[in-house]
């Protein structure tokens, strides 16, 4: 009987394969990085062939390290960087162009032109998303318009489009020899082409971006047996697909409305389960699909993205030289009792949710002769917590549903000082799970549920365990004063970049 599940975690900088047992414990993993390609300023690309080669390699390496054979796997799940666009030839399996990565801004002008007629929110009621080059639709439109012969191939079904999950599934299940062309609802919801109401491609959106329906994958559930892998693990069921942030929500077992997680990395991604109906946002958030289990209604989510959190620590290290390694920031921040009145607003390229101010720029404010390196370090950590509070308060306003606690994952959660301050400024507990790889775990859970390796969502909840829990310690007046100072600092960051300057 199979006693493990494998998860492919295909991220922006690397690809991993992680093997989990029935308790959700990691048995083994393997990882390979891939090249970041920057053809022009603002352009970011990946080589889809390199990503597939790396995926193939880490699957074999990870399984070998676990001491298992393919027949020991009950299923394979996939989680992936979202929005990144791939276009390939179904006959040869060759990409028609390098993948255009979610960070890429080459379509800013075309998106701005669309926004002039109806504003950036003109399609939010259908897709849940503001108009932005971030999402896949404008990237696919660019590929069809700029790659020779691409539009004709798309119209006759010779060319196939997908986000990275689609590319991997197609190759895993045979490629040119009968490979499946599918994507799940979470990834489809990030293209700006899917209706949140029907969970199908929206004809009006296809018309706006001039996308032939023949090029698009079939939209499937996040947890369902899609088929069997052929290479490198013949016969192993492919049972689940989730975009990376939705996978983290699933891995944190946030299955009920009002349950939320925040992933702390270079930036932060906070998601809140809002239940079986989409919740429109008037507070600067994105409405998206959280997941859909096979044969059941979908769960929806509100999402808030924060551009700069962990990257601020890197900036202290690399640009200012205040620390020699990122791990040193906690010790430096603990060298002072508080922030000394100092605030850092990391608006290096504007502010994301909930403000969405392109004209904001970073600032350090509140400096006096008393302030020292420790105060600046502490203010940098606190900036992450303040921004997270802004997003969670927006979620509560939009949904009308209180968030009782925040489940935290990602690299920054090793910083106990940050986690304590997060609890303090939120006035609610923050929790770090024992299994830190929640994104890959979410993909494994989705796949294992589909094949019966785990029977119910309650089985997954039983697996979830707390590594550490932080409760708020500061008084209400101190909390109010700290956040008021942050709010004043944020306001002063606005308007620094003048229009047409």
Curated annotation (Swiss-Prot):
Q: Which residues bind glycerol?
A: 82-83, 134, 244-245
Pathway assignment reads:
Polyol metabolism; glycerol degradation via glycerol kinase pathway; sn-glycerol 3-phosphate from glycerol: step 1/1
The alphabetized UniProt keywords are:
ATP-binding, Glycerol metabolism, Kinase, Nucleotide-binding, Transferase
Annotated residues that bind ATP are located at: 12-14, 266, 310, 314, 411
Top-level division of the source organism's lineage: Bacteria
Report the function annotation for this chain. Key enzyme in the regulation of glycerol uptake and metabolism. Catalyzes the phosphorylation of glycerol to yield sn-glycerol 3-phosphate.
From the Swiss-Prot or TrEMBL record, give the protein name.
Answer: Glycerol kinase
**Which species does the entry assign this protein to?**
Methylorubrum extorquens (strain PA1)
Instruction: Please name the gene that encodes this protein.
Output: glpK
């Amino acid at each position: 009987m199979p006693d493990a599940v494998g998860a492919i975690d295909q991220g922006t900088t690397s690809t991993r394969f992680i093997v989990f047992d029935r308790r959700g414990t990691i048995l083994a993993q393997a990882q390979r990085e891939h090249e970041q390609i920057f053809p022009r300023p603002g352009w970011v690309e990946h080589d889809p062939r390199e990503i597939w080669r790396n995926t193939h390699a880490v699957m074999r390496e990870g399984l070998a390290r676990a001491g298992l054979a393919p027949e020991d796997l009950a299923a394979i799940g996939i989680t992936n960087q979202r929005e990144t666009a791939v276009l390939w030839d179904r006959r040869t399996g060759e990409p028609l162009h390098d993948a255009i990565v979610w960070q890429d801004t080459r379509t800013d002008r075309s998106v701005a032109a669309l926004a002039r007629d109806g504003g950036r929110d003109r399609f939010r009621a259908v897709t849940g998303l503001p108009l932005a080059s971030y999402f896949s639709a404008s990237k696919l439109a660019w590929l069809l318009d700029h790659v020779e012969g691409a539009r004709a191939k798309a119209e006759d079904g010779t060319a196939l489009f997908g986000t990275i999950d689609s590319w991997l599934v197609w190759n895993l299940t045979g490629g040119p020899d009968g490979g499946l062309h599918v994507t799940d609802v979470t990834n489809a919801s990030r293209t700006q082409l899917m209706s949140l109401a029907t969970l199908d491609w929206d004809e009006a959106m296809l018309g706006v971006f001039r996308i032939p329906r023949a090029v698009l994958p079939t939209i499937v559930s996040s947890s369902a047996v899609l088929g069997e892998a052929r290479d490198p693990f013949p016969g192993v069921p492919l049972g689940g697909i989730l975009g990376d942030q939705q996978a983290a929500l699933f891995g944190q077992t946030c299955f009920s409305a009002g349950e939320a997680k925040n992933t702390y990395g270079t930036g932060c991604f906070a998601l809140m389960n809002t239940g079986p109906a989409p919740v429109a946002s008037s507070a600067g958030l994105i409405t998206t699909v959280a997941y859909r289990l096979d044969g059941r209604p979908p769960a929806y989510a509100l999402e808030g993205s924060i551009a700069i959190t962990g990257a601020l620590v890197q900036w202290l290290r690399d640009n200012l030289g205040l620390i020699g390694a990122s791990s040193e920031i906690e010790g430096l921040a603990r060298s002072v009792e508080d922030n000394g009145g100092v605030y850092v607003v990391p608006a290096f390229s504007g502010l994301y949710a909930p403000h969405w101010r392109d004209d904001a720029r970073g600032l350090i404010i509140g400096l006096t002769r008393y302030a020292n390196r420790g105060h600046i370090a502490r203010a940098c950590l606190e900036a992450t917590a303040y921004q997270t509070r802004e997003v969670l308060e927006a979620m509560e306003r939009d949904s009308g549903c209180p968030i009782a606690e925040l489940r935290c994952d990602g690299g920054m959660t090793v910083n106990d000082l940050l986690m304590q301050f997060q609890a303090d400024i939120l006035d609610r507990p923050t929790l770090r799970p024992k299994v830190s790889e929640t994104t890959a775990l979410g993909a494994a859970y989705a796949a294992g549920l589909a094949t019966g390796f785990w029977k119910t969502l309650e089985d997954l909840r039983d697996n979830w365990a707390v590594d550490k829990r932080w409760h708020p310690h500061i008084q209400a007046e101190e909390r109010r004063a700290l956040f008021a100072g942050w709010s004043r600092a944020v306001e002063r960051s606005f308007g620094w970049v003048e229009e047409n300057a």
